[in-house]
Amino acid sequence: DWTPNTNHTGVYVAAERGYYKEAGLEVEIVQAPENGADALVAAGDAEFGVSFQDTMASYVSGSDPMPVTAIAAIIQHNTSGIISMKDKGITSPAEMAGHTYATWELPIEQGVIERCVEADGGDFSKVEMIPSTVTDEVTALSTDQVDSIWIYWAWAGEKCKLAGLDTNYFAFADIDPVFDFYTPVIIANNGVIEDDVEMVQAFM
């Protein structure tokens, strides 16, 4: 969610209709870098941002956690899954074996893929992991840059649909309830939460 999409409608409606001003806030909506808003918020360059519950796990744990906290869910369920062109024959996680997958190289991401593939009777070691350079899912799939991509349906899936791509898709939440985590979430800088609770509450 590093580019504006329908998941962010509420933020833009609040800005356009003056809800932020009514709450005594001056809100500037800025474009996050392609690697997400997390580092921007952690550095204090933004008070709030959009992230994902699963990707947060790797950087809020450990000996030097990133100083951010999820304060709200934008969507109550996980709307993500794996999309591929129909002619690749990937209708289930097991069938990802023998095909390429665009990975963000995150431990939790790859752990989810491994669990899904193995639980479905597939061989995770045969899933060819390619470091993801995907910025346009339609182009990446239609030109065979990669066979399968982890997407969030609310925009990337609809984008592929609008482009007329003939695709297969399976959602993680349908595979195992444990994967029905919040996506996406609103995060805040921990220092901001501690120092200005009233502002955070007003923003929400």
Which residue ranges define each predicted feature?
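Short, glycine-/small- and polar/acidic-enriched structural segments
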Residues: 1-143, 147-154, 170-174, 179-180
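N-terminal low-complexity, intrinsically disordered segments
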Residues: 166-167
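Extended ligand-binding regions for polar small-molecule ligands
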Residues: 17-21, 182-204
